[in-house]
Amino acid sequence: MSKVVFLSNVDRRFAMMQVALQQLQQENLLSNDSVCAKLSDNTVWNDEWQKLLEDADILLLKWMGAGLDTPFFKKLLPFIKKHQLRYYIDAAGTEEEELVSGIEKNDLEKLKAYALYSGMKNYRNLFLYANGILTGKTDIELPDPMYWSAIYHPKAKTVYTDLAAYSTAETA
C-alpha cells in the first residue's frame, strides 16, 4: 500500500476525510502511514512537515481562502517539486485554482469528482483511488453524484451534476 497524505484548511472536509482515513486503516484497506492533517493560514513549515512528506507517495490538498502565497506554501511547493511527489492541490478561489503533477488527466477527473460529490462514501473512495493510482488498482467504485451535489427538477429523468447538461436537457 502507498502513503497517501491529505491536507486541508477546510474544517468539515478535514473532519470527514479524517474519519474516512481511520475507517480504511482499521479495515486494512489503506496504509497506516497515510495521514490526514489540518492546515491554517498560520501553519509553519518545519522538519515535521518534511518528514511527513518526504516518503509520501501522493499528496492531496484542499485549500480555500487565502492564496498559495503563505510562508507554508512558499516552502511546501519547492519541496514537493524537488522530491517529485505526485500531487493535486485544489485551491479553488485562489489565483492558482489548482496545481497538479504526476497525475494523469483521467485519474485527476475522478479525484475531482470524488471530492466534489462529497459524502463519506466518496471520501473513502477518494483515498482508495489515490492509493490505486500508485498500485495500479483503480477499479474503485465510480464517484457517486449525491443528490445534494446536483440540480433538481421534478420532471427530470435523471440527476444533473452540471449546468450545461441540465440546460440542454428536456425536462418536460
Predicted regions located by residue number:
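An N-terminal assembly and electron-transfer interface module characteristic of large anaerobic redox
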Residues: 1-172
